[in-house]
Amino acid sequence: MKKLINKTIILSLFVALTGCNDWLDVSPKADRKAEDLFGTEAGFRDALVGVYALMCGTNSYGRDLTYGYLDVLAQYYNSPLKTTSSGYEHNFKNAAEYKYTEKTEESRISSIWSNHFSAVANINQAMLFIDENKGVFTSPEVHDVYKGEFLALRAFLHFDILRLFAPSAAMNNNKGLDALAIPYVDVFTNIAQ
């Protein structure tokens, strides 16, 4: 009988404690609402650091857009493209052979594109709040520095996407100047397209 009472008490406590809304409404520490994040100068700094962290990834300037993928496309490396006796082929074999429709290359190109636009989306999110929350900065000059850095990074990322993905202006007797190139995104939307 005592065991039954103990089990009933434990079960009742479990149900009472897990049924509480505060226990169920838990968000990760790294996941913050935009209003909370951009309510302090430190939040804007965190957002800026987050953009730089995206830019340091291996599918961005941490490898592919510095010494990796682009250098292979430019044929800076004279790597053996054939399989060696150990079965090794280098990571950029398909890129060196201009096989862009291979799954690995499509994935690499897609990750470069999406990583850049993810950074642009983070910048645009910060730009929604930067003038509205001008008072959280220690001085107007600090506000201007943050805003300028966000704007410069957005322009830089768009230019790099243009450089990588737009048709050459010199193509087809300079008709490339009139060709559609890339989307210029200056407003944050949370809608998948």
Regions found by a protein language model. Name each.
Residues F165-Q193:
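Short coil/linker segments at helix-helix boundaries
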Residues K29, G57, Y69-Y100, V187-T189:
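A structural signal for short, hydrophobic/glycine-enriched beta-strand patches
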Residues M1-K29:
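Bacterial Sec-dependent N-terminal signal peptides
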